[in-house]
């Protein structure tokens, strides 16, 4: 008995195309925009390093050693490769490589909530129909599309390479699946691919894109032809046919399959990134952009990993900052060694920073810092970014910007423009209403010499 005779046609496609555990395969369905606002691209790929929960800028990239103790915290600053510029003592590898990065100390917006803040970071837009409570603001098809989804909508690919991959997991906390992680109102056909395995696990394997044993490309093409004949008997579903085509292209793309074989990296390289989820996620991100994936979102931890209301300094010192320091240093060095630094735009940011004043939550004994979107810091590098400088400034308490500020919308516009898509590009929602894909302004200052 043949495989096809024992399976429904779509089940057969799903299995043959490798929609296996560990990856969510998109299902194209929305209509693309007429005008992608095409322009010259600075980058071939973007890596968004998402510090979900909100990194304390005061204890990392914008320290205030002269401030009172309740502001400055417990850490000491150290010198960097940039004269007169200091960052946290627990970021020594980054400090030595600051000539690669532009450090922006005047990121700012007005949303102190995790869910709407992350939506802004991941989409470059405010949340449509934002509600009052977190339970009402979870992931939905009302969301604005994330960068990979909008790119897929505006610039559909035909080479078997996904427009975006999110790793190493989605942002989910109990009943809350954080918004901004998929195609939103553009429909599930444009959702980015989602890795749901820890690349640091010794059992990490993404067989999703591998041909089954004994199956070659010619046999896949034969199966595809058979499915097309079967589908031609009726009107069919155009969205499903597009999904079918995309699935077969992914299956035949050895570049995608090979990117997930992180076990093929030399031990020295893997060790250099750090044998933890942060490090191996950024190594996998490098492999994906090397394979041609245009947008990789690397979540550095679960949803509130950087949400240091309690034990701010212990959590940062003992794990978060050392892991991030090593991983970012290795990523920058590796991208450069592979000839990818100049064609990859790297963004490192959370949804906001932390409060200037140290506080202790009711019922807790170990202090921390609360949410603070009024000013915070981020790192930008690669793809023409002029590194080795600090852009923007906060006040003496790290509470407000005292120079021109940049919002997540501007980060989003810069991501789009770096890939050659104008932020004024038009997308249409489910009601066919036109909108700019991003209302922000590109951060041209990143690419300008002083």
Question: How would you name each of these model-derived features?
Answer:
Residues 1-450:
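Ligand-binding pockets and gating/stacking loops
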